[in-house]
């Protein structure tokens, strides 16, 4: 589950006429606060019964997998061969596909949705088309242009908008690692998807604390935690799941058992340590395809097990090789 969008994106919804202040969480019971890496595939990992859909989607991406059945087996194998060449060229170019090169390819594939969302944002924010996104451009494209001292004079709840603007600017400054007030594509990616970047971890934690710490003591108390998940209606009996969340707070969130969450504990909650899914899948594909057991894959070994990596009209393939190389 992805980290909730920046408040600037919520503001876009507000300005389009949405009623009321939106919750900073997406998903049931506030679980949108927690960033889990998206699964490589929703399909079962069922190689034992000849179902390689999971591997196809992990190797090529879920959306790409929808295109697989358009190709003949011959076309599929030919295009897989081209992917193999590209994987090796992206690495050391020694004619073999190493575990690291295979992992890098799978990770790159799984990040495509992020690259696509950043490309769309880039087209919106780079208003002067100079190949960079300045803070002024992003601010004006998102909030509208205001003269100094007149910010949000024409909207209701101007103070809330000002806080949102300040919060977005703070996040932008952290993402802007060289401090020139101009975001490169990588820096804009960090701004829009901070959960993907180690140097943005502290800002994700700070924003979560600001959202939940109602008494401003620097901690998240259990009642503040629950208030983010559930608002009781007059006379309403508290649902059983709320008590379960209290137990979750006590048993798993509050690591030092002092009855509250500090910044480190908030970070452990919203940005939990993640399994390296691309590495797990790369190891699996290597194990299943490395016939001479030398710890690397030749092109012949991959093509010899081609139906695990990709498919054909009977299974799948995708648009990876119908896209321009710089899109992949």
Curated annotation (Swiss-Prot):
CDD domains reported for this sequence: EFh_CREC_RCN3
Annotated Ca(2+) 2 binding sites: 126, 128, 130, 132, 137
Binding site for Ca(2+) 4: 213, 215, 217, 219, 224
Domain EF-hand: 75-112, 113-148, 163-198, 200-235, 241-276, 277-312
SMART domains tied to this protein: EFh
Sequence positions that bind Ca(2+) 1: 92, 94, 96, 101
Claim: Repeat is one of the keywords in the record: yes
Motif (Prevents secretion from ER): 325-328
GO terms classed as biological process: collagen biosynthetic process; ERAD pathway; lung epithelium development; phospholipid homeostasis; positive regulation of peptidase activity; protein secretion; protein transport; surfactant homeostasis
Gene Ontology terms: cellular component: endoplasmic reticulum; endoplasmic reticulum lumen
Residues that hold Ca(2+) 3 according to the record: 176, 178, 180, 182, 187
Binding site for Ca(2+) 5: 254, 256, 258, 260, 265
Family of this protein: Belongs to the CREC family.
Subunit structure as annotated in this protein's UniProt entry: Interacts with PCSK6 (immature form including the propeptide); probably involved in the maturation and the secretion of PCSK6.
Role played: Probable molecular chaperone assisting protein biosynthesis and transport in the endoplasmic reticulum. Required for the proper biosynthesis and transport of pulmonary surfactant-associated protein A/SP-A, pulmonary surfactant-associated protein D/SP-D and the lipid transporter ABCA3. By regulating both the proper expression and the degradation through the endoplasmic reticulum-associated protein degradation pathway of these proteins plays a crucial role in pulmonary surfactant homeostasis. Has an anti-fibrotic activity by negatively regulating the secretion of type I and type III collagens.
Protein name: Reticulocalbin-3
